[in-house]
UniProtKB/Swiss-Prot annotation:
UniProt keyword Membrane present: yes
Name listed for the protein in its UniProt record: ADP,ATP carrier protein 3
Catalytically driven reaction(s): ADP(in) + ATP(out) = ADP(out) + ATP(in)
Family (UniProt): Belongs to the mitochondrial carrier (TC 2.A.29) family.
Region (Important for transport activity): 241-246
Motif (Nucleotide carrier signature motif): 241-246
Gene Ontology CC terms: mitochondrial inner membrane; mitochondrion
Membrane topology per record: Multi-pass membrane protein
Residue stretches of each Solcar repeat: 10-103, 114-206, 214-300
Entries under InterPro entries matching the protein: ADT_euk_type, Mit_carrier, Mitochondrial_sb/sol_carrier, Mt_carrier_dom_sf
Length: 307
C-alpha cells in the first residue's frame, strides 16, 4: 500500500473518530432543548392521538409543563437513541464528506463557483448516504421524545424505551413503519447537510483569516450562522417527516410526503410547518459546537489544518 493510500486511511479514521465524539458530547448537552423542539413540532399530531392535553404556548411553557409533569430527567428521554444514532451519523458525515469531496476534484483555483458547488454536493451526498444506516434510530428517538405523559391516558407512556419502540412498531406496521418519512428525510438531509458542510468549508477561508484564523469563538459563531440558515431552510421537510413518523401504529396515516404537507397546511396553516423552529435555532448551537470542535480537536490532537 502506498504512503498516500495509508495517509488517506489514517485521515478517514481521524475524521470518523473526531466527528463522532464531538457529536455525542454536543447532542447530550443539547438534549433538553431538542426534546422541547420535537414536542412543540409534533404537538398537533399528539393532540389528535390523545397523548397531549393541550397545546404549548411556546418554548418556556413547554419547558415548565414537561418539568412539572415528567421531571427534569425526562428532558433526556430518547437521548440514548440519539447518541447511538448521532455518533455514526456525524462520524460518517464527516468521514464521507472528505472522501466524496476528493471524488469531485474541484480546486478553488478552478473557479469559486465550481469549488462551492463541489462542497455543497459532497456535504449533501455524505448526509444522504449516512441516513441509510441510521434512519430507524432517528425514528425511535422521535417517538420517545414525543411520548409525553398525558392525563387523558392516566399518565402512562406509549413506549417504555428504545427496544419497546422497535417491538411495537414492527408488530403494528412492520419494517416499513421504522422508515416512515424516509423520502422527505433524504431530501431534507441533502439540503441541510449540503449547506451545513458546503457553506462552512467555502466561507471559512474567506472569514477565518488574519487574527480570526484558528479562533475557536470565530469558528463557533460561523458554524452557528451556517447551521441556523441550513436548518431553517430545511425545517418544513423536517416537520413533514416527523409528522409522518408519528403515524406509525395509528389507524390514519398520510399517503406520502406531499399528502402530509397538504393536510398540515390545509388544517393548521403554513405556520405549523415552522412550529418549534425557534427551539431549533437554539439547538443549532450544538451543531455549531460539533463542527468547530471537530476542527479544534483535529488541530490539537493531530496537528491537521483544513485548507
Amino acid at each position: 500500500m502506498s504512503s498516500d493510500a495509508k495517509q488517506q486511511e489514517t485521515n478517514f479514521a481521524i475524521n470518523f473518530l473526531m466527528g463522532g465524539v464531538s457529536a455525542a458530547i454536543a447532542k447530550t448537552a443539547a438534549s433538553p432543548i431538542e426534546r422541547v423542539k420535537i414536542l412543540i413540532q409534533n404537538q398537533d399530531e399528539m393532540i389528535k392521538q390523545g397523548t397531549l392535553d393541550k397545546k404549548y404556548s411556546g418554548i418556556v411553557d413547554c419547558f415548565k409543563r414537561t418539568a412539572k409533569q415528567e421531571g427534569l430527567i425526562s428532558f433526556w428521554r430518547g437521548n440514548t437513541a440519539n447518541v447511538i444514532r448521532y455518533f455514526p451519523t456525524q462520524a460518517l458525515n464527516f468521514a464521507f464528506k472528505d472522501k466524496i469531496k476528493l471524488m469531485f476534484g474541484f480546486k478553488k483555483e478552478e473557479g469559486y463557483g465550481k469549488w462551492f458547488a463541489g462542497n455543497l454536493a459532497s456535504g449533501g451526498a455524505a448526509g444522504a448516504l449516512s441516513l441509510l444506516f441510521v434512519y430507524s434510530l432517528d425514528f425511535a428517538r422521535t417517538r420517545l421524545a414525543a411520548d409525553a405523559k398525558s392525563s387523558k391516558k392516566g399518565g402512562a407512556r406509549q413506549f417504555n424505551g428504545l427496544t419497546d419502540v422497535y417491538k411495537k412498531t414492527l408488530k403494528s406496521d412492520g419494517i416499513a413503519g421504522l422508515y416512515r418519512g424516509f423520502m422527505p428525510s433524504v431530501v431534507g438531509i441533502v439540503v441541510y447537510r449540503g449547506l451545513y458542510f458546503g457553506m462552512f468549508d467555502s466561507l471559512k477561508p474567506l472569514v477565518l483569516t488574519g487574527s480570526l484564523d484558528g479562533s475557536f469563538l470565530a469558528s463557533f459563531l460561523l458554524g452557528w450562522v451556517v447551521t441556523t440558515g441550513a436548518s431553517t431552510c430545511s425545517y418544513p421537510l423536517d416537520t413533514v417527516r416527523r409528522r409522518m413518523m408519528m403515524t406509525s401504529g395509528q389507524a390514519v396515516k398520510y399517503n406520502g410526503a406531499i399528502d402530509c404537507l397538504k393536510k398540515i397546511v390545509a388544517s393548521e396553516g403554513v405556520g405549523s410547518l415552522f412550529k418549534g423552529c425557534g427551539a431549533n435555532i437554539l439547538r443549532s448551537v450544538a451543531g455549531a459546537g460539533v463542527i468547530s470542535m471537530y476542527d479544534q480537536l483535529q488541530m490539537i490532537l493531530f496537528g491537521k489544518k483544513f485548507k
